[in-house]
Design a protein with these regions (language model features):
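Kelch-like beta-propeller repeat domains
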Residues: 1-297
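Membrane-embedded alpha-helical segments of small multi-pass membrane proteins
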Residues: 470-474
Length: 495
């Protein structure tokens, strides 16, 4: 790989949109502010806007495509400066400083927070610094700091990486109880931000300090943590030590060609790049690429985002995949595979239950598959039966709407073509005018199928004058009958 333009160690490296940014560091024991961008695709370096504060031994992290440069060493002092670089605009801005000024630490991003753990801070007695167990958390969303549970064993010059949402703090140094050289440690301290608790994992096999660590994410290689290089007992290492979180064990990978410490390691598409550093004599501009254990053996990861495990009237097959493929296809109801390369509609599906799975094959022959999704198709409209009113005349203006629907649905009615009125069940209609009326009930089921049913009825109450006339006729008839009977009775008596 093309060497970095500016030889240096104690730098920070970060990846944004597939490009590596090498920032700051130390060269000839002087802090530098260089900011150089490396493009692995073109194997070219480009100068970018320097960091406002030249420093080394700082922590670096990426959040929301911006690079956070925090803390570090300037001369013989430790700082808490928090400067943020935006590659999209090639500009820097300053944010809230870290509460505890310190250096020789790392930054880890978990759940939108940046964790800065341990490191070294100023001491008033020789050697004028001490390791610290501070665990401070920066929230980029509101530019604020908070404190979490301290690391059990305070260290500086360690390496760290994140796997499965946990932060691994590996190796490092601590001052002895009496003046002298530093004590090197091989601990593997694990912090869980979700529980704010610490635990221990398998120790680093070969003790080292000022190495670098990074993790692969299962993109092209298995998810592993890599501890590379470092320094121990006047010896600079090129070892690659590989940690497997699945079984809490270490193994050994291919050694780095240039043994060194104070380097930076970046990961692009599960390929590692070891950049810069110090080999005991020279500040380095080395840029060495490492393809990790099992690289190229991991199948593509594909996930079906639509359909889900529910019922549909129309079905769109949509998916997410983590990298390019040579071929993709789906199998519906265990039938033959159908080739696809983008979102597609599944047409002519029968009523009822279905299953679907997607397969993806990469250029290396690795076949991946999604989970199987079970779903149902329902294209039938709800069936509505109106019991009342019926297609007839009614003498009352107070009408009860009574009906049934054969499935859960959103309900409404419309009277005489007016706007729909939402209801939840049977209801009494508003007072109606005399004459004919049209009533339609609507039902829309949970997947959008709509049905309707209409009845026609008439409001025709008996007129008041008609009733009075009938009563009068009956009264007259009764009176006439009475008089007739009375006269007949009188005639009989006279005879």
């Amino acid at each position: 790989m093309t060497p970095m333009p500016t030889a240096r160690g104690g730098l920070g490296v970060a990846v944004v949109n597939g490009k590596i940014y090498a920032i700051g560091g130390s060269s000839d024991n002087l802090p530098v502010n260089n900011n150089e961008e490396y493009d692995p695709v073109t194997n070219q370096w480009t100068e970018k806007m320097p960091t406002p504060t030249a420093r080394s031994g700082f922590a670096i992290a990426v959040y929301n495509n911006k690079i956070y440069v925090i803390g570090g060493t300037v001369g013989n002092g430790y700082i808490g400066n928090n400067e943020v670089y935006d590659p999209a605009t090639n500009t820097w801005e300053t944010k809230a400083s870290m509460p505890t000024p310190r250096s020789d630490l790392t930054a880890s991003v978990v759940n939108d927070k940046i964790y800065l753990i341990g490191g070294k801070k100023y001491s008033s007695t020789s050697p004028y610094f001490n390791e610290t167990n501070v665990n401070e958390v920066y929230d980029p969303a509101n530019d604020s700091w908070s404190t979490k549970t301290p690391i059990p064993t305070a260290v500086y010059g360690y390496a760290s990486a994140v796997i499965n949402g946990k932060i691994y703090i590996i190796g490092g140094s601590m001052n002895p109880s009496s003046p002298g050289s530093s004590v090197f440690v091989n601990s593997n301290q694990v912090y869980d931000p979700q529980t704010d608790k610490w635990s221990l994992a398998a120790n680093l096999p070969d003790v080292a300090t000022y190495g670098a660590a990074a993790s692969t994410q299962g993109f092209m290689g298995p998810s592993r943590l890599y501890f590379i290089g470092g320094y121990f007992s006047n010896s600079f290492s090129g070892k690659t030590q590989v940690y497997n979180p699945d079984n809490n064990s270490w193994s050994t990978g291919v050694s780095m060609p240039t043994p060194r410490a104070y380097l930076g390691v970046a990961v692009v598409n599960d390929v590692l790049y070891a950049i810069g550093g110090f080999d005991g004599e020279n500040w380095l501009n080395a840029n060495e690429q490492y393809k990790p254990v099992g690289y190229g053996t991991v199948p593509p990861k594909v996930q079906i985002t639509s359909p889900e495990n529910k019922t549909y009237s129309n079905v769109t097959l949509a998916f997410a995949i983590n990298r390019g493929t040579e071929w993709m296809g789906y199998s519906l109801d265990n039938q033959a595979n159908v080739t696809i390369n983008k979102e597609t509609k599944l047409l002519d599906l029968s009523q009822g239950a279905h299953s679907i799975i997607i397969y993806a094959n990469d250029s290396l022959g690795n076949m991946g598959s999604s989970n199987t999704v079970f779903f149902s198709v329902d294209t039938l409209a709800p069936n509505i039966v109106i019991m009342l009113p019926q297609n007839q005349s009614y003498g009352s203006t107070d009408i009860q709407l009574t009906f049934t629907v054969n499935e859960n649905a959103t309900l409404a009615y419309s009277l005489d073509g007016q706007e729909k009125v939402t209801i939840i069940g049977n209801v009494t209609l508003p007072a109606l005018s005399n004459g004919s009326h049209r009533l339609t009930v609507y039902a829309t089921d949970e997947v959008g199928n709509s049905g309707s049913e209409t009845v026609y009825f008439n409001i025709a109450p008996f007129p008041t004058i008609t009733v009075a006339g009938i009563v009068a006729i009956i009264t007259i008839a009764l009176a006439a009958g009475y008089l007739f009977l009375k006269r007949r009775k009188s005639s009989n008596i006279q005879e």
